[in-house]
Amino acid sequence: MKHLIRRLSRVADSSSEFSIRRSTSSFRNRRGHHRLHAPPPPWSICPARRVNTVPAGHVPVYVGEEMERFVVSAELMNHPIFVGLLNRSAQEYGYAQKGVLHIPCHVIVFERVVETLRLGGFEGSGDLENLVASLLSGDELIPETTE
């Protein structure tokens, strides 16, 4: 596991595809005053279509068969649920995968897991506990969307 995390750090730092920017950047508003962007929250996740660079403290990952790119907070890597996803990735792709980390999980499931972590965890949410248990066992369920 340490080997995989070290490898992720090197990929995020050295990849020519991604440039790391400072977590607080300034810009001028209409009146010419500088404003600072707040750094992203620790449990943040950003779809790639909105993010061209990888902020400091974040790691790019590809999720699902669609290989949709997300930028995930490095703090998330220590959570037991995400460690399970990393273990599943290592089983499926091995530790020698090159480039960005691939997470073998449906995009909708990944988004729900990260959103639940951001909102405070899995305590008391039976549906998500079942979803994560099935995710880590390899029997992936795709939740219904209410769009």
Swiss-Prot record:
Keywords: Auxin signaling pathway, Cytoplasm, Developmental protein, Growth regulation
Domain of life (superkingdom): Eukaryota
Stimuli inducing this protein: By auxin.
GO cellular component: cytoplasm
Subcellular localization: Cytoplasm
InterPro entries named among the record's database cross-references: SAUR_fam
Keyword Signal: no
Tissue expression summary: Specifically expressed in the quiescent center and cortex or endodermis initials of root stem niches. Expressed in vascular tissues from hypocotyls, petioles and cotyledons.
Predominant location: cytoplasm
An annotated GO BP: auxin transport
Sequence intervals crossing the membrane: none
Extra remark beyond the main annotation: Plants over-expressing SAUR41 display pleiotropic auxin-related phenotypes. These phenotypes include elongated hypocotyls, increased length of primary roots, increased numbers of lateral roots, increased vegetative biomass, twisted inflorescence stems, overexpanded petals, reduced seed setting and increased basipetal auxin transport in hypocotyls.
Primary role: Plays a role in the regulation of cell expansion, root meristem patterning and auxin transport.
Family: Belongs to the ARG7 family.
Protein name, per record: Auxin-responsive protein SAUR41
Naturally occurring in which organism (per UniProt): Arabidopsis thaliana
Gene name tied to this protein: SAUR41
